[in-house]
Amino acid sequence: MPSPLRQLLELMIQAVETLESVCEEKGISLPDLHAPYTPASEAFLRIPAAIEAANVITAAADHMSAIVSPPTSYLYKFLGGPCRAVAIRACLESNVSEIIREAGPSGIHVDDIAKKNGHDAQKLARFLRYLATHHIYREVSPDVFTHSRLSCFFDTYKPSAEVIANPKQKYDNTRGFAAPASHHLDITFKAAALAWETMDDPKTGHSDELTDAPFARAFPEDKTLWNLLERDAFARNRFDLTMVAVAQRQSPDSIFRAFDWERLPAGALVVEVGGGMGTSAFPLATKYPEMRLVVQDLPDVIAKAEKLWTEKMPDALSSGRVVLQGHDCFAPQPQTDAAVFLLKMILHDWSDEYCVKILRQLRAAARPDTALVIVDCLVPLACRLDDAAEAALPGAVGPQAPPPLLPNYGTVNEYVYNMDVMMHLLFNAQERTVAQFTRVLLRAGWRVCAVHRTQEGNGVFLQSVEAVPA
């Protein structure tokens, strides 16, 4: 039998051949690592067969590295995490990406970068070289750096002089990766530094309280992220842009695949709990004109939503087909005729105890035939599951990589595990496995009946769990 290394190599070769064949058939090119990112360069990631091939290549490459690398070298990828974060933040906040973009493809010397942003040239060179070792930026000659496909994501595409002169407005009106990177490398990073102390403290280690999250230890004057965002306009704007970036990882019509909306009768009521501005309600209201929708959130959010709906879909409001309602999800649910309660990216903000409180309010207001639809990340296990688990609950297992790869595709889905840890750091909350959702829902009087997965998000990012009254 071939060695695991040989099996991984064969999987990688087959995946590369598939990827190249698909791209040739579609007349598209694979990205050039040395060329700036463009939406067109990522066109292959809209083809299902290419996505799967890319996932196998990525998982196999890291798996092979784990086999052949000296253990200490491989482990330093994790131990060196703070160093990577520091290097990225230094370049991000000192506006290196904007300066490099303006210099053009031939690059710019760190001395000239330093003249523009006022920072130490030698320190900038060390950070840039560290990142270039991971293909983030490129060192084209000694101390001369230019962009790579990856480093472009830290660029706001504003003039460097503007962001240098107005750092508090740097992320205003941007829609890229720079704002979320800044948020995570600032607030989340500081909370992470005290995660172990929080976990090891008998007073907080087993707590489900929001005010016992690692964030609270890092920011004792605020205690919760929401308090910090209320007092800090820059952090608030940056956080809002981070949420926009997360939403952009899914297509607007993804909500149509979260549930079989076609089965609802005309006039059915759908209540989106914690619906914000109504991101999910807009496409539903457009596609299903006979559907009634209630979007619930806190009053200040609903006030902003009313302005948006008045601009985008005023007839839906004036006709009463869409209602925007101020509501606290921990209070008794006023809507008692819902065909569907929809919660998208809500439960991951809360620990199990608080999720049960939210879900019990919905259960008390539910009809016998009410469906509960939860859209959140589904954390895959790192072990392989058999067919019995899938047979017991359709969609429970999700996609599994071919052996000898880890069944969860290894680092391909690392984003979801990052999200899980970030929820812990900021909110003492979590992303959940299907089994964890099942347990929480049962405690609140709901029974999971199906899991709806799509290849978008690799079957783990923002997928749907459907439940009915138990």
Swiss-Prot record:
It holds the Pfam family Methyltransf_2. Keywords: Lignin degradation, Methyltransferase, S-adenosyl-L-methionine, Transferase. Its EC number is 2.1.1.-. InterPro entries: COMT-like (IPR016461), O_MeTrfase_dom (IPR001077), SAM-dependent_MTases_sf (IPR029063), WH-like_DNA-bd_sf (IPR036388), WH_DNA-bd_sf (IPR036390). One of its GO terms (biological process) is lignin catabolic process. S-adenosyl-L-methionine binds at G274, G275, D297, D328, C329, K344. Optimum pH is 7.5. One of its GO terms (molecular function) is O-methyltransferase activity. The active site is at H348. S-adenosyl-L-methionine-dependent methyltransferase that preferentially catalyzes the methylation of 4-OH phenolic compounds like coniferyl alcohol, vanillyl alcohol and ferrulic acid. May play a role in promoting lignin degradation by methylating and inactivating free-hydroxyl phenolic compounds, products of lignin cleavage which are known inhibitors of lignin peroxidases. Belongs to the class I-like SAM-binding methyltransferase superfamily. Cation-independent O-methyltransferase family. COMT subfamily. This is 4-O-methyltransferase 1. It comes from Phanerochaete chrysosporium (strain RP-78 / ATCC MYA-4764 / FGSC 9002) (White-rot fungus).
